[in-house]
Design a protein with these regions (language model features):
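Non-catalytic terminal/linker segments enriched in charged/polar, low-complexity residues
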Residues: 1-128, 132-140, 158, 162, ...
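P-loop/Walker A NTP-binding module and the surrounding RecA-like catalytic core of P-loop NTPases
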Residues: 116, 125-346
Length: 346
């Protein structure tokens, strides 16, 4: 049995433990060239990861402390993070000792298995959006300035439309100049309804409350709420986000169904600081990683899940509205291991 088969069976067994017939299951297969997009989006991460591991394995004739130190350096360079890296390397060491392996070329499967099983651990990797049938589902997007939040919302909206859901947008970013116009432009391109502020400098919480109410009255399946980019150090803006979350719950205690933090993948471990600060204000349900094609640090997914147990919901790359993928661990594994010389193809 190949490593792919073993890992995928573990993943599928975990997924099968969680099934809710009330949830809307999204299908990434509605998109064309999904596998190609994953390859493109994670190319830098794949190249760095595979090339680094191959060099370590082929340049070391024995398994010693230096060998494990080089693996540790590779994981840290991928933004896996100190804690996760130490745990993963320790697990690799223990397995190598247990199997009494002394040939570096024989531990490739162990390295990969421990890396990705660590991501799964004993938890269920719930990457599907928590959307309920016959309800107006509210998804709140937030993050710091410049992460590509508004474009991400357009990408998610397009993806949901491809899943035959009735989607609308709420322009809650009343602070940034041109933000409402930018979202409105996307709405027109995608032929999606949008709720905009009714007066200049309107309180964003009131815009979102009115927008969610309007979406519910018009029987939309999903309403995507844009918010102003905010630095986690600005107390007043963070309190504003808390207020926005509260007014949504005032309309419906079960909403928002998803509160998604949008993070720029190129900032590496700084994303952990952002996640920590935002999680103190709003209960984050998942992460959207943008600009994943511009970095070799795809290992940040391990650090985020390790520190906050937050699932990755979407990967974004490029400027096109189609440049988005639901996070799929099976696809992620295949791309991360592409061209790893010993692996047999399924």
């Amino acid at each position: 049995m190949s490593i792919f088969k073993k890992l995928f069976d573990k993943i599928k067994n975990l997924k099968q433990k969680k099934s809710n017939s009330e949830n809307i299951l999204l299908n990434d297969g509605v998109k064309k060239n999904s596998a190609v997009n994953f390859d493109h989006g994670l190319k830098k991460t794949n190249n760095f990861f595979v090339n680094s591991l191959n060099k370590i394995i082929y340049k070391n004739v024995i398994i010693d402390d230096e060998f494990f130190h080089k693996i540790e350096e590779t994981l840290l360079s991928m933004d896996v993070g100190n804690y996760a890296t130490n745990k993963i390397v320790s697990a690799i060491k223990n397995e190598v000792k247990f199997q009494n392996i002394d040939n570096p070329n024989l531990i490739k499967q162990i390295i990969i298995d421990k890396l990705f099983v660590y991501y799964i651990q004993d938890t269920i990797v719930q990457t599907n959006l928590n959307l309920k049938a016959n309800e107006t589902n509210v998804i709140l997007f937030f993050g710091v300035n410049g992460v590509g939040k508004t474009t991400t919302i357009a990408k998610v909206a397009n993806f949901l439309q491809q899943n035959n859901l009735k989607v609308c947008l709420v322009a809650g970013d009343t602070f940034r100049a041109g933000a409402v116009e930018q979202l409105d432009l996307w709405a027109k391109k995608l032929d999606i309804k949008i709720f905009k502020p009714t007066k200049p400098n309107q309180d964003p919480a009131s815009v979102i409350y009115d927008g969610v109410k309007w979406a519910s009255e018009n029987k939309f399946n999903v309403v995507l709420c844009d918010t102003s980019g905010r630095l986690q150090t600005k107390t007043n803006l963070m309190n504003e986000l808390k207020k926005i979350n509260n007014v949504i719950k005032k309309f419906d205690p079960n909403q928002p169904c998803e509160s998604l933090l949008v993070v720029d993948a190129t900032i590496g471990q700084s994303g952990l600081i952002q996640a920590k600060c935002f999680s103190e204000v709003v209960k984050i349900s998942g992460i959207v990683l943008t600009k994943i094609d511009s970095t070799s640090g795809g290992g940040i997914i391990f650090a985020i899940k390790d520190n906050f147990n937050l699932p990755l919901k979407f990967l974004c790359f490029g400027e096109k509205v189609e440049d988005i993928e639901m996070f799929d661990l099976e696809k992620f594994i295949k791309v991360m291991l592409k061209n790893f010389s010993f692996l047999e193809e399924e």
